[in-house]
From Swiss-Prot:
One of its GO terms (cellular component) is plasma membrane. The chain crosses the membrane at residues 12-32, 38-54. One of its GO terms (biological process) is regulation of cell shape. This is Inner membrane protein YgfX. InterPro entries: YgfX. The keyword Transmembrane applies. Residues 1-96 are annotated as: Not required to inhibit FtsZ or MreB polymerization. The gene is ygfX. Interacts with MreB and FtsZ; interaction with the latter requires FtsZ residues 33-49. It is found in: Cell inner membrane. The keyword Membrane applies. Disulfide bonds: none annotated. A probable inner membrane protein. Has been shown not to be a toxin, no effects on growth are seen in LB or minimal medium up to 6 or 21 hours (respectively) after induction of expression. Interacts with cytoskeletal proteins FtsZ and MreB; inhibits FtsZ GTP-dependent polymerization as well as MreB ATP-dependent polymerization. Restores production of prodigiosin antibiotic (Pig) in Serratia strains with deletions of sdhE-ygfX; overexpression of this protein and CptB also restores Pig production to a slightly lesser extent in Serratia. It is a multi-pass membrane protein.
Length: 135
């Protein structure tokens, strides 16, 4: 039985926060007074920041699609069923779910509040908090 479901959208807040953090790190690398002999080092560091920024944006974009919370702490997402391993870590802007598949694969799923409707966000928080108190 489905307790809750939503069609997750891309979280614009998560995208902007990722871009802001990566941009600040890149700015610090560029503005530091590097000696000329350190040019290869700061170029490698800057390349790593850019590649990590791209990877971060791809991961954020992958966090969309239909998601369902089932009975007994199970979650159906991206065509797979996951068990919620621990109580979710919640803040006002999102929650972190620690998941494990039947095959033993583990994953951390960040659900941002702006990736779903406000009513869906409230319902999900309420249901998960109720399940937490019943354990």
């Amino acid at each position: 039985m489905v307790l809750w479901q939503s069609d997750l959208r891309v979280s614009w807040r998560a995208q902007w926060l990722s871009l802001l953090i990566h941009g600040l790190v890149a700015a610090v690398i560029l503005l530091m007074p590097w000696p000329l002999s350190y040019t290869p080092l700061w170029m490698v560091l800057l390349s790593l920041v850019v590649f990590d920024c791209v990877r971060s944006q791809r991961r954020i974009n992958a966090r969309q699609g239909e998601i369902r919370l089932l009975m007994d702490g199970r979650l159906r997402w991206q065509g797979q069923e996951w068990s919620i391993v621990k109580a979710p870590w919640m803040i006002k802007s999102g929650m972190m779910l620690r998941l494990r598949s039947d095959g033993g694969k583990r994953q951390h799923l960040w659900l941002a509040a702006d990736s779903m409707d406000e009513a869906e966000w409230r319902d999900l928080r309420r249901i998960l908090l109720q399940q937490e108190t019943q354990r």
